[in-house]
Amino acid sequence: MKEKTGYYGEFGGRFVPETLMAALYELDSAYHRLKDDPGFKAELNSYLTEFAGRETPLTFCRNMSEYCGCKVYLKREDLVHGGAHKLNNTLGQALLAKAMGKKRLIAETGAGQHGVATAIAGAALNLPVEVFMGEEDCERQKLNVFRMELMGAKVHPVSSGTKTLKDATNEALREWAKTVDYTHYLIGSVVGPHPFPMIVRDFQSVIGEETRRQCLEKEGRLPDTLVACVGGGSNAIGMFYPMLNDDVRMVGVEAGGRALTPGNNGATLNTGSPGILHGALSYLIQNDDGQVGVTHSISAGLDYPGVGPEHSMLKDLNRVEYSYVMDDEVLEAFSYLSRTEGIIPALESAHAVSYVLKNRDSFDRDDIVVICLSGRGDKDVSSVSKMFGGEE
């Protein structure tokens, strides 16, 4: 990638109104100044270990390994404080915002996990937080809305458009443009205009760095295959990036939803085409007129119609395989992991688990397969129980 211009091959860039250009340049320059600063790194590391609970374990799944006929490990991002990998990024960006003298954080959220992680970081660093969340997502994730409010964040339900993550992001960008002098927009995935995809990737790379080290310690070699779910793609890029130059197969798993027909999935890299959304050029789910298409996924965190520009480049280079699984397969994987390993995965993460279960015949006995378990499933238990016909 040309770091200076923020392009990954042909993807990425800064397609934003003039009012935001200065803020993006300011953020880029502050990040380059601070990312290698020993004081900043030490403070971030201290928060990640003492507060977020890193490093996270690399858990060997005995029962699933036996069933799949290979060695299956889970990288346990579900054990990070707050229940998902999101805090790796929000702590980093909140510290960055503080160092830049910003007085307030705003964020967009889909499943609510990024909103919760931003609220946690804001509370820990004493920065006020406002979160934009689609009305439909607020309804799907009531518990996360309450969690955010409990930690002092103000949640703005967004009623425009499809009332989901795309619309929440539009509102957050509008708010940022109005209050850019004292506000930091804390983007939750490797999307948006440069330098956001780079910053989020770097803060999430701790996942892959730890996995690399832990696998060498446990197995004496690197994994054969890494598998992670892809919505915007931050847990996946965090897992993949530190091993891109190694001989490791990588699979990103998108939301196949109900079907691969328009409006029924969130499989951007499998069904989309290049276009511009939220300030960057990347693959998009769009109609013939170039309008952003309707998406669907069983998991609120994977129904984003775009994807990180670096993933778009990795797809076109054939460095990473991008696959998909369907909603019903995800539910099976959700139940399977809970039942056989005693670990309830987030519906997002269950997409990655499902891919391994579904493709178990393609692995050899000695293959080491690492799944990024990006989050825990507590937030999904009540909606899944309804799908299974149970009581809440």
From Swiss-Prot:
Pfam family, one: PALP
Gene: trpB
Its job: The beta subunit is responsible for the synthesis of L-tryptophan from indole and L-serine.
Subunit and partners: Tetramer of two alpha and two beta chains.
Intrachain disulfide bonds: none
Molecular-function GO terms, alphabetical: tryptophan synthase activity
Assigned protein family: Belongs to the TrpB family.
CC annotations in GO: cytoplasm
Keyword terms: Amino-acid biosynthesis, Aromatic amino acid biosynthesis, Lyase, Pyridoxal phosphate, Tryptophan biosynthesis
Top-level lineage group: Archaea
InterPro entries according to UniProt: Trp_synth_b_CS, Trp_synth_beta, Trp_synth_beta/beta-like, TrpB-like_PALP, TrpB-like_PALP_sf
SUPFAM superfamilies for this protein: Tryptophan synthase beta subunit-like PLP-dependent enzymes (SSF53686)
Pathway: Amino-acid biosynthesis; L-tryptophan biosynthesis; L-tryptophan from chorismate: step 5/5
Upper lineage: Archaea, Methanobacteriati, Methanobacteriota, Stenosarchaea group, Methanomicrobia
Classification via PROSITE patterns: TRP_SYNTHASE_BETA (PS00168)
Reactions this protein catalyses: (1S,2R)-1-C-(indol-3-yl)glycerol 3-phosphate + L-serine = D-glyceraldehyde 3-phosphate + L-tryptophan + H2O
Keyword Lyase in annotation: yes
EC number: 4.2.1.20
UniProt xrefs under CDD domains: Trp-synth_B
Cross-referenced PANTHER family: TRYPTOPHAN SYNTHASE (PTHR48077:SF3), TRYPTOPHAN SYNTHASE-RELATED (PTHR48077)
Name of protein: Tryptophan synthase beta chain
Cofactor(s) the record lists: pyridoxal 5'-phosphate
PTM sites of type N6-(pyridoxal phosphate)lysine: K86
